[in-house]
Design a protein with these regions (language model features):
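A short, acidic/glycine-rich surface segment
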Residues: 55-61
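Mid-chain, well-packed structural core segment of small domains
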Residues: 64-86
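Core segments of cupin and vicinal oxygen chelate
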Residues: 2-3, 7-53, 81-104
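Short secondary-structure boundary/capping segments
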Residues: 39-40, 61-64
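Short hydrophobic/aromatic patches at helix-to-coil boundaries
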Residues: 115-118
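Short, acidic, Ser/Thr-enriched surface-loop or helix-capping motifs
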Residues: 107
Length: 118
């Protein structure tokens, strides 16, 4: 029997509502916003939370001066279509692209994330 369940992942950021809108729109999950906190939730229950942090410093990937501590990989059917959609939402395509079956982007708070195909 499991000791715990995986209820949510919490990501620090400078603007919780903005980052929730970015990922909520990308994943088509329900967005809930409160002061300094926001979350997105899938219909099947998975949740990602966003915690507003003063003096937030974005990670610098692939360097390690300010290392990433986590990043999201999301699966897509069409890399080109998904790239256009996340760029329109406010993502930035990272200059370092180390693979061919995925693409690396930065969310509006500077966290790396990948769009991946099988």
């Amino acid at each position: 029997m499991a000791i715990a369940r995986f209820p949510s992942l919490v990501i620090d950021c400078p603007d919780a509502a903005e980052l929730a809108r970015f990922y909520g729109t990308m994943l088509d999950w329900k967005i809930t916003v409160s002061p300094n906190w926001a979350e997105i939730r899938a219909d099947y229950g998975d949740c990602i939370c966003f915690q507003q942090v003063e003096d937030y410093t974005p990670p610098q990937w692939p360097g390690q001066q300010v290392p990433q501590q986590t990043h999201l990989d999301v699966n897509v059917d069409d890399l080109d279509a998904a790239e256009a959609a996340v760029l329109e939402l406010g993502a930035t395509k990272h200059e370092h692209q180390p693979g061919t079956s995925f693409r690396v982007f930065l969310d509006p708070a500077g966290h790396p994330f990948c769009l991946c195909v099988d």
